[in-house]
Amino acid sequence: MSKNLTTRAEDYSKWYNELVVRADLAENSGVRGCMVIKPYGYAIWEKMQAELDRMFKETGHSNAYFPLFVPKSMFEAEEKNAEGFAKECAIVTHYRLKNDPDKPGKLMVDPNAKLEEELIVRPTSEAIIWSTYKGWIQSYRDLPLLINQWANVVRWEMRTRLFLRTAEFLWQEGHTAHATRKEAIEESEKMMNVYADFAQNFMAIPVIKGLKTETERFAGAEETYCIEALMQDGKALQAGTSHFLGQNFAKAFDVKFANAEGKQEHVWGTSWGVSTRLMGALVMTHSDDNGLVLPPNLAPIQVVIVPIFKTDEEFEKISALANDLISQFKKLNISVKFDNRTTQKPGFKFAEWELKGVPVRIAIGPKDLENETFEIARRDTLTKEVKPKEGIVKYISDLLAQIQSDLFSKALQYRDTHITEVSDFEEFKKVLENKGGFISAHWDGTPETEEKIKELTKATIRCIALNRKEEIGNCMFTGKQSVGRVLFAKAY
């Protein structure tokens, strides 16, 4: 099996696009800007879903489902949110087709089936959910209300890329209501921390926790918390956001509760979400010129066993050994595949599973039967070693944990060596052009300066890091006083 991938050094963007398709993760569809997530790619998303869903439930959230369609009048109730998403909305105006009298066999929109009110295909669900919460919340005893939804949303993107930016994508969106400002802020921070925990412990991706600037903040939020990751090409990727909504949506939809004294108050809200964009982050953080590199905690197949044989007798003996290994792996919840296809040679199988990023490969041939050994190959380092049969399951279990840890350490080292402090704009432009990564610089706090820097360099403020140190300085662009550094980068 010839991989022949474009290398990252040749063309990083082309490498990514080829890899997503060649590794059977996803492909473009017949609908502009929409993708087909293939079974192998969806299996990774399912593992992500399962872990996140567990984490949400452990923090007290329940799943629900709300309509795909939002009446236009409802959508525009919270003005900032409506304005922020207006240019990306798909709109349903009619509810029926009919045969076209001028074109036999063709259909046309029935002009008599116009909706009284247009329906927006949800780009996000705050409007429909908060209009529902009005009927669910009457008293402080109904709070907090902690709801999550797994759904698809539509944002009519003009420039699309598989997983990173598509017109339709899968995601989860949490929407919570609280009795106090303090509780809502704590919820926003908690969910940012849940996302960071997931990124680091399952995706093996180090992230920076921070706050978005006013310009980058979610439309309709008072504060947006985020986690920012760095890809191998030195570009940042926003991996998750958690918004403190204040009382904006509660006031827009008149969601009130009677407090302990019987007085009516508006509730306080949050919303938070991650999407299939995480799939793109996973691919770009760890993969190499040979294909995918998957962290064991999210790999659909953690171990693949490839038999090498010439006779039916050898194949039967290897199969018996492999099936014994499989039953032992399953007891440890290690997902394993025995690639016993007789239509492909071992070399083809090695290349295929390398391309698909399976963390560990076990090869068993006639010599291994004779010597009671196995050849073990690591996908992340491409190293091989021969190990005795005795204790092999425990060894591989430990090896998977080591690979998970090593992938995180490698990504962390890359990230940390690509955070550069600069003091003036000329230095900023040089680092951005020649090195990339996060650039730590003083900023005067104004949207005007932020916009001008973006216009000149295409770099944006990714976040105001929560762990930044207090440091008075001067804005690298205007020279005005600054109270602390922020992180700039070019981004996906």
Curated annotation (Swiss-Prot):
Keyword terms, alphabetized: Aminoacyl-tRNA synthetase, ATP-binding, Cytoplasm, Ligase, Nucleotide-binding, Protein biosynthesis
Q: What is its EC number?
A: 6.1.1.15
Localisation:
Cytoplasm
Specify where it is mainly localized: cytoplasm
Query: One matching Pfam family, short form?
Result: HGTP_anticodon
GO cellular component, as recorded: aminoacyl-tRNA synthetase multienzyme complex; cytoplasm
Q: Which reaction does it catalyse?
A: tRNA(Pro) + L-proline + ATP = L-prolyl-tRNA(Pro) + AMP + diphosphate
Q: What Gene Ontology terms for biological process does this UniProt record contain?
A: prolyl-tRNA aminoacylation
**One term of GO molecular function:** proline-tRNA ligase activity
Q: Function, please?
A: Catalyzes the attachment of proline to tRNA(Pro) in a two-step reaction: proline is first activated by ATP to form Pro-AMP and then transferred to the acceptor end of tRNA(Pro).
Q: Which PANTHER family match?
A: BIFUNCTIONAL GLUTAMATE_PROLINE--TRNA LIGASE (PTHR43382:SF2), PROLYL-TRNA SYNTHETASE (PTHR43382)
Xref: NCBIfam families: proS_fam_I
Family to which the UniProt record says this protein belongs: Belongs to the class-II aminoacyl-tRNA synthetase family. ProS type 3 subfamily.
The entry's free-text remark on domains says: Consists of three domains: the N-terminal catalytic domain, the anticodon-binding domain and the C-terminal extension.
Assembly and oligomerization: Homodimer.
Q: What is this protein called?
A: Proline--tRNA ligase
Q: Which organism is it from?
A: Flavobacterium psychrophilum (strain ATCC 49511 / DSM 21280 / CIP 103535 / JIP02/86)
